[in-house]
C-alpha cells in the first residue's frame, strides 16, 4: 500500500487513513463515494476519468439497460411487498431508500442513526416526501422487544432482519465490497432472490460470524 500511486476513497470510514497516507507518504486520494443513484454513479466514473487525464473511456449502456430491466422485473414481482433496511447493510441507507422509493418500491422502515455526508439530502427528502416511512434508531436495548416485527417483508441487512423477524432476509453487511452499477444491480437481484426464497436469518447471522 505504501507504494500506491492513488487511493480511491469509496467509504467515509477510510477518509482518515487516506488523509494520513497523503500526509506521510505523499499518496493522493480521490473521493468517489459509493452511490445508488445512477446519475451519481456515472459522475463518479467521469470524475475518475478526468483525474486520469481522460485516458479512460467508459460505456455503461449495457449496465444501465440491465439495471432498468432488473428494476422493472423486481417491481412487477414485489409490487407493494414491504421492504425494510438498515445502515449495516449499505453505507448510505437513506440514499438507497430514496432510490427504492423513487422507483415505486414500498419502503416501510429504515433502521439507521444520523445521516452522514451525501446521505443528509436524501434523509431530508424522505422526511419531507415520504412521511409514512418509519425512521428508527436501532441502538436501543429495548428495540428488540419493540413492536417492529414485520415477518412478511424483505429485510436488507442482518440488523433489520433481526429486529423485524423477517422471513425474507438479504444478508448484506457493509455492502460486501460492491460498487457502481454492478453493485446496485447485484443488491436488487438479491432482493428478488430473498423474496422468492424464504431465508434462515439465524443461518445468515452465523455465516457472517456475528454475535447477537
Regions from the language model: what does each represent?
Residues 1-212:
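An N-terminal assembly and electron-transfer interface module characteristic of large anaerobic redox
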Amino acid at each position: 500500500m505504501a507504494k500506491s500511486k492513488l487511493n480511491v476513497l469509496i467509504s467515509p470510514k477510510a477518509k482518515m487513513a487516506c488523509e494520513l497516507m497523503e500526509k506521510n507518504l505523499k499518496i493522493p486520494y480521490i473521493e468517489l463515494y459509493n452511490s445508488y443513484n445512477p446519475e451519481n454513479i456515472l459522475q463518479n466514473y467521469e470524475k475518475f476519468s478526468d483525474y486520469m487525464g481522460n485516458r479512460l473511456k467508459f460505456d455503461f449502456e449495457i449496465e444501465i439497460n440491465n439495471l432498468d430491466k432488473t428494476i422493472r422485473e423486481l417491481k412487477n414481482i414485489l409490487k407493494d411487498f414491504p421492504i425494510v433496511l438498515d445502515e449495516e447493510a449499505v453505507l448510505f441507507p437513506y440514499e438507497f431508500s430514496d432510490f427504492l422509493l423513487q422507483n415505486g418500491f414500498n419502503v416501510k422502515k429504515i433502521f439507521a442513526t444520523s445521516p452522514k455526508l451525501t446521505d443528509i439530502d436524501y434523509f431530508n427528502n424522505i422526511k419531507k416526501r415520504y412521511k409514512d416511512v418509519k425512521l428508527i434508531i436501532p441502538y436501543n436495548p429495548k428495540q428488540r422487544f419493540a413492536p417492529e416485527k414485520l415477518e412478511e417483508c424483505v429485510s436488507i441487512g442482518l440488523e433489520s432482519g433481526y429486529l423485524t423477524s423477517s422471513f425474507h432476509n438479504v444478508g448484506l453487511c457493509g455492502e460486501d465490497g460492491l460498487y457502481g452499477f454492478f453493485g446496485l444491480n447485484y443488491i436488487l437481484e438479491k432482493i428478488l432472490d430473498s423474496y422468492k426464497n424464504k431465508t434462515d436469518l439465524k443461518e445468515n447471522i452465523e455465516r457472517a460470524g456475528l454475535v447477537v
